[in-house]
Design a protein with these regions (language model features):
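Serine-dependent carboxylesterase/thioesterase catalytic core
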Residues: 125-135, 141-244
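Flexible, membrane-associating and regulatory peripheral segments of lipid-active enzymes
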Residues: 1-124
């Protein structure tokens, strides 16, 4: 068993945000009910605010990406209906992730795989992207476990706003723990977004080439991303993400 990260700074931040958001719903709702509002309408209003906030989060990523989209071949077009369905699924994923999977990462998204599961092949290490934690890849983890990959480990990036180099060093230590825990000689690395950059740096500067049997990057901004543009002053990692 590898060392559990427990609450990361990211998870603690989202837990506090969840408590504050919940307290605001309760306080404002209680005030509205005391003023004579229908409790059912108050609950509906709170739910509408909750879902709308998650919708705005998705739009904040979707719209810049849509404006900077690359030209597509005709065979890659999915049409308006499929695009809308994809957006709705992303919205629902945001409802589950912000705040639940993020805020409750020690319980809902442990670093270690469940004990006693059958496994085939090399152990798998999942590496989430910027400003996320293990909870973000819970669906990937669950899918791999259902598919017979019982040794799936997940790492939360730390520290959140530091450089990709710091995260790659953190990944190097984590991979060594996984190899010691499983007795395997190599791992499979799967990274999402910034997780792919972290894996690339780990492979080339932290001795990961000999320890990775396979490395997969999904949606990683190797050429930079417009979502990070203009936010470089928030931390060195934003500058790296804006340029790739």
């Amino acid at each position: 068993m590898v060392r559990e990260q427990g609450f990361t700074a990211h998870g603690r931040g989202f837990f506090i945000a969840f408590v504050v958001e919940l307290a605001l719903y309760v306080l404002i709702g209680a005030g509205c009910i005391a003023a004579g509002a229908d409790p059912v309408h108050v609950v509906h209003g709170a739910l509408a605010v909750f879902f709308t906030l998650r919708l705005l989060l998705v739009l904040g990523n979707f719209l810049p990406s849509w404006r900077a989209r690359s030209p597509k071949r005709a065979e890659h077009e999915i049409g308006a209906a499929a695009t809308l369905a994809m957006f709705i699924r992303e919205w629902w994923a945001a409802v589950l992730t912000y705040p639940f999977l993020f805020a409750f990462e020690p319980w809902l998204a442990p670093n270690n795989p469940p004990a006693g599961r059958p496994h085939r092949g090399l152990p798998v290490v999942l590496v989430p992207g910027f400003f996320t934690n293990r909870g973000y890849l819970s669906a990937w983890r669950a899918h791999l476990l259902r598919s017979g990959y019982g040794k799936v480990y997940t790492l939360s990036p730390e520290p959140v706003f530091e450089s990709v180099e710091r995260n790659a060093g953190h990944l190097a230590r984590f991979v060594d723990e996984v190899l010691a825990d499983t007795g395997a000689g190599q791992v499979i690395l799967i990274g999402h977004s910034m997780g792919g950059l972290t894996i690339r740096l780990y492979l080339h500067r932290f001795g990961g080439m000999d320890k990775a049997g396979l490395a997969i990057a999904v949606g990683s901004p190797f050429g930079g991303t417009v979502v990070a543009a203009g936010k470089e002053r928030l931390g060195p990692i934003l500058g790296q993400l804006s340029h790739g």
